[in-house]
Amino acid sequence: MASWEAQEELRELLHHLPEDDPPADLTHLLELDEMEPKVLCGENPGDEKLKKQVIKTPPMHPSTVTWHFGYKQKEDQQDNIKMRDWVPDPSKMSKSTCKRLILLGLYQACKAQEIIKMDYDVHWEKSVVNEQYFEVEYNCKMCRTVLHEPMPIMYDPETELWVKPGRLRGPLGSAVYTLKKHYERCLLTLPSLKGTRLPKRRCNPSRRYETFREHPPTRKRRSKEGIPTDQQPSTSNGDPMALLSGPCGPHSIQPPSCLLQELPKPEVGSPEMAVAMSGGPFWEEVYGDSIFATPLGSSEDQLLSQFD
């Protein structure tokens, strides 16, 4: 006995209609293959949407997308815009690579390595004082404190490197020591939950650099040998003996005991030596003890004094 599904299939076959038969002439299908695509363009409402789905643009690098949609349009609208975290060539470097190049331009490799290991958020933005300069700041991730870099940085398009504007690192100072002390202090305390701390008010790095460049500081520099150029005594009490020539001078390898040779020495058997050996004038007056006098005291003390 056939099942219920088999009976339904048999019933559908019995109710076959004439229009369900395939057409005898199939020449119109060959004409569809010979038609050009331009003929159908515009007739189908979803033709343009279908083309956009089929033709896909290649994916862009994230840094390129950020630069194009974040800075390219702003640069076209405003020429003197203050750019933040600007990447000169996104096709060759990312923000992380640009940050490392900036730190290598500001400091030596060992100092830049210390800053990267301390894991600060490094940001840079275009200066309003000079369009070529970029001001660098360091944001602490633990307490959100903003620390400023005293030296501005600039990008050289010819060499494609980040370089310092000039050689004024000494007068301007360094931020490595401040970053290290702040990082060590934050490790010992809990992060601040009261809100963002405002950055310390200080002079603009670009304006400060321009001031030092126009008016260089006139400070006395120490010579390479370690002797001041003005030949003033370098001792704490102002005694110029350390700068004199001789065995006790700064360039001598003899011990300081040579100074004792210049002091007066008491002669053996003199009253000064007797007073010094007996314990001083107070000891001699009170106890009558002296190396030239007869020892005082009991017989027991005299007996013990023979074995001294």
Swiss-Prot record:
Which residue intervals are annotated with compositional bias (Basic and acidic residues) in the record? Answer: 207-217
Q: Where is the composition biased (Polar residues)?
A: 229-238
Q: Which InterPro entries match?
A: Foamy_BEL (IPR004956)
Location, primary (coarse class): host cell
Q: Name one GO biological process term.
A: viral process
What compartments host this protein? Host nucleus
**Where is the motif (Nuclear localization signal)?**
217-226
Q: Where is this region: Transactivation domain?
A: 228-304
Protein role: Transcriptional transactivator that activates the viral internal promoter (IP), thereby enhancing its own expression. This transactivation is repressed by nuclear factor I. Also transactivates the long terminal repeat (LTR) promoter, thereby inducing structural gene expression, initiating the late phase of infection. It is therefore a key regulator of viral gene expression. It directly binds to and activates DNA target sites of viral promoters and those of distinct cellular genes. Required for viral replication.
What is the annotated quaternary arrangement, including any partners? Answer: Homodimer or homomultimer. Forms complexes with the host nuclear factors NFIA, NFIB, NFIC or NFIX.
- Under what name is this protein listed? Protein Bel-1
Q: What is the lineage of its organism?
A: Viruses, Riboviria, Pararnavirae, Artverviricota, Revtraviricetes
